[in-house]
Amino acid sequence: MKRVVLLLAYQGTAYAGWQRQPNDLSIQEVIESALARVLGKPIVVSSSGRTDSGVHAYGQVAHFSQPDHPLFSQPQSIKKMLNAILPKDIVIRDVVLSDVNFHARFSAIAKEYRYSLTRSPKPLPWQRYFAYYPRHSIKIDLMQKGAKYLLGTHDFASFANHGRDYTSTERTLFKLDIIDNEEIVTIICKGNGFLYKMVRNIVGSLLDISKEKYPPEYIQEILAQKSRRKGPPAAPSHALSLHHVCYPKPYNWFCTPECDINSLKEEK
């Protein structure tokens, strides 16, 4: 039995998210259909996480397990064959083989999401699919002050939408950076895991601070309430991307130096 691991990127605009849906097209459905054509049998794929409708990915990781197949000794052939039949908005970046102890979701030690804001009411044509225009001045200094209250380990129940069951709503944010590139502002959010719509709700709270709906320190009160009822509105999905998933050795095929667990602890 082999476990095949995929590194993939996709533009989520045309899809109802990662997970299969009864009446809508999903990334998972397209990937599984392509694999069935390549391997000649039904395939079920598990991902590192279920991105929502409209959300993109640069570094999504997924895996599937099947009895030996001649192609399993040629992972780059699998990559080439999949990319030949997948639509242009889904790309397999790499394929590797693993032992069956690896799991795309449960082996992950951290994820990094990126959210893009634009200062332009009429962004460049391709930016409208990947960046959100908030219709007010983006005040980086205020957003950075609010972001510092979210770093570290907290109960993020106020930032989680209903719809998922969790044994705990406690998560750790290692990084919450706001990078100003003039026209585009990028919010980089890295943590050991994320609740349903947590990143979009964090961005929503920072945007409320930016338009001075409340002061940066109010983030502490939102956290303390531990209730979504008083939480911030979610930012739109189309500007969010799953950028990277970190795994420990020996499963760090796609990792950067920042994925080392010791460096993650230092950032915390």
UniProtKB/Swiss-Prot annotation:
Q: Which residues bind substrate?
A: Y113
Q: Which Gene Ontology biological process is one annotated for this entry? A: tRNA pseudouridine synthesis
Q: What is its EC number?
A: 5.4.99.12
GO MF entries = RNA binding; tRNA pseudouridine(38-40) synthase activity
Q: Which domain of life is it from?
A: Bacteria
Per the record, the similarity remark reads: Belongs to the tRNA pseudouridine synthase TruA family.
* Function as written in the Swiss-Prot or TrEMBL entry: Formation of pseudouridine at positions 38, 39 and 40 in the anticodon stem and loop of transfer RNAs.
**Protein name listed in UniProt:** tRNA pseudouridine synthase A
Q: Which organism is it from?
A: Chlamydia felis (strain Fe/C-56) (Chlamydophila felis)
